[in-house]
Amino acid sequence: MPQLNPHPWFFIMLASWLTFSLIIQPKLLTFVTMNPPSNKPPIAPSTTPWTWPWT
C-alpha cells in the first residue's frame, strides 16, 4: 500500500509546515487590525417600519 510509505509525502508535509510556521506566520502576525475591539456596548440601530404601497 503506497499510502503507508512515508517517503514521498512526509518531506513535503514537513517542508510546507516549516515554511508556514517560520516564514508566513510571522509576516501575518505583524499586521495590525483595522478595527481594533473597543469597550463600547453595541448599539442597536433604530429602524422605521416599512410602509407598503398598497396599504
From Swiss-Prot:
It is found in: Mitochondrion membrane. GO terms for molecular function: proton transmembrane transporter activity. GO terms for biological process: proton motive force-driven ATP synthesis. Keywords: ATP synthesis, CF(0), Hydrogen ion transport, Ion transport, Membrane, Mitochondrion, Transmembrane, Transmembrane helix, Transport. GO terms for cellular component: mitochondrial membrane; proton-transporting ATP synthase complex. The keyword Mitochondrion applies. The chain crosses the membrane at residues 10-32. InterPro entries: ATP8_metazoa, ATPase_protein_8. It is a single-pass membrane protein. Its main location: mitochondrion. Component of the ATP synthase complex composed at least of ATP5F1A/subunit alpha, ATP5F1B/subunit beta, ATP5MC1/subunit c (homooctomer), MT-ATP6/subunit a, MT-ATP8/subunit 8, ATP5ME/subunit e, ATP5MF/subunit f, ATP5MG/subunit g, ATP5MK/subunit k, ATP5MJ/subunit j, ATP5F1C/subunit gamma, ATP5F1D/subunit delta, ATP5F1E/subunit epsilon, ATP5PF/subunit F6, ATP5PB/subunit b, ATP5PD/subunit d, ATP5PO/subunit OSCP. Belongs to the ATPase protein 8 family. Subunit 8, of the mitochondrial membrane ATP synthase complex (F(1)F(0) ATP synthase or Complex V) that produces ATP from ADP in the presence of a proton gradient across the membrane which is generated by electron transport complexes of the respiratory chain. ATP synthase complex consist of a soluble F(1) head domain - the catalytic core - and a membrane F(1) domain - the membrane proton channel. These two domains are linked by a central stalk rotating inside the F(1) region and a stationary peripheral stalk. This is ATP synthase F(0) complex subunit 8. The gene is MT-ATP8.
